[in-house]
């Protein structure tokens, strides 16, 4: 394991070797010479870190080239060299001067991958995460190697990545404890007269000082009996007033890069009836769906049960993303989404997953949101946060 003090929480050598062994099993089963994948950021770039324990950052692409019979080769921008002591299972890093905003530099990045595939004489090449591999890369590879078969191995890699080892769950639980501490501090931070972005800045500072690696914070406030929504940073300029209520969503990773999510409503004084009623439905809806987090269940069944529950009580149904697994990625498979003619999640719930469930109810009079992480055991789900369910009264 890395012992350099510059890394907050390195993953162990044993854990990396476990992952590599699983990948090599997949390559052997699929008769594939190698697999490649890309990432460009931390909150949705988990493939790269899962293979290497090195995050992709700042929207600069990082490419992992993983052969079936050798150590990895990495492709990175020459603007961000990796120290030698941080490399494990890596034979070499190939650097090139590229940046996604410099359209003409894409060929420099692509050339690293072309040269590697050609040098290996690969005939069957796997890839994972097609939504992360940019068009210049795939177009060039398909044109340059017309006789090479490119195989999507995303499902196979995702199935392994979704099941958390004991060490990975240690990281996830540490992140949950960090969230718990931020929520405990919230009443001392939020006060009337502050801009929403100032509250956000204090929360980010606190999480960072406790070891968090990346912080996405959604925050909205409004007068009672109106909707506050859940604004992103661009729309967090409102000044908080006495008597307001709000929604706070923390999408914050801990030391080691594992994500959790947590959300609660808060209110200056007692909430109005419409807000209090909707919040209670959120609590009940999450309890219902958490009870359904059992091995073998399709996630689409959980979404259907949730939508039926809230619709019967007169609230909006979820048409986007009700829940999902988490790890190095903020959103991992399986996703909890409604049936869609263009494609559905086919990964079932399994023991060892760490899932986020987030009932969200909004109308003209209120916005309520509850979010917690649950670890799936053979006997059902275990909530890993200790935040009280009650709305926070300030």
Name each region found by the language model:
Residues 1-394:
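Active-site neighborhoods and metal-handling regions in enzymes and metal-associated proteins
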């Amino acid at each position: 394991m890395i012992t350099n003090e510059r890394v907050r929480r390195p993953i162990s050598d044993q854990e990396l070797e476990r992952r590599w062994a699983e990948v090599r099993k997949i390559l052997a089963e699929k008769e594939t010479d190698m697999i490649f994948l890309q990432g460009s950021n931390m909150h949705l770039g988990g493939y790269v870190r899962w293979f290497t324990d090195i995050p992709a950052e700042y929207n600069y692409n990082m490419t992992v080239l993983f052969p079936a019979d050798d150590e990895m080769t990495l492709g990175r921008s020459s603007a961000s060299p990796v120290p030698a002591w941080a490399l494990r299972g890596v034979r070499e890093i190939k650097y090139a001067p590229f940046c996604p905003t410099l359209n003409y530099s894409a060929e420099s990045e692509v050339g690293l991958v072309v040269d590697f595939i050609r040098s290996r004489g690969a005939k069957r090449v796997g890839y994972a995460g097609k939504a992360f591999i940019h068009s210049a890369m795939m177009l060039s590879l398909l044109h340059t190697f017309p006789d090479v078969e490119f195989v999507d191995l995303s499902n196979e890699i995702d199935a392994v990545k979704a099941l958390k080892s004991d060490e990975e769950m240690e990281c996830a639980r540490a992140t949950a404890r960090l969230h718990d501490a931020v929520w405990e501090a919230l009443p001392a931070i939020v006060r009337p007269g502050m801009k929403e972005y100032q509250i956000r800045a204090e929360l980010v500072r606190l999480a960072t000082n406790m070891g968090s690696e990346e912080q996405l914070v959604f925050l909205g406030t409004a007068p009672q009996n109106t909707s506050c929504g859940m604004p992103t940073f661009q729309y967090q300029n409102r000044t908080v007033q006495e008597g307001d209520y709000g929604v706070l969503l923390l999408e914050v990773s801990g030391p080691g890069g594992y994500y959790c999510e947590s959300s609660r409503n808060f209110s200056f004084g007692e909430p109005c009836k419409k807000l209090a009623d909707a919040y209670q439905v959120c609590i009940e809806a999450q309890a219902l769906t958490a009870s359904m987090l059992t091995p073998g269940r399709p996630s689409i069944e959980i979404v259907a049960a949730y939508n039926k529950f809230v619709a019967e009580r007169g609230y909006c149904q979820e048409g986007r993303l009700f829940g999902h697994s988490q790890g190095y990625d903020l959103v991992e498979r399986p996703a909890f989404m409604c049936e869609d003619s263009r494609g559905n999640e086919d990964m079932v719930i399994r023991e060892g997953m760490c899932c986020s469930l987030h009932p969200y109810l909004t109308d003209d009079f209120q916005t309520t949101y509850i979010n917690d992480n649950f670890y799936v055991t053979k006997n059902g789900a275990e909530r890993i946060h200790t935040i009280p369910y009650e709305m926070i009264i300030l």
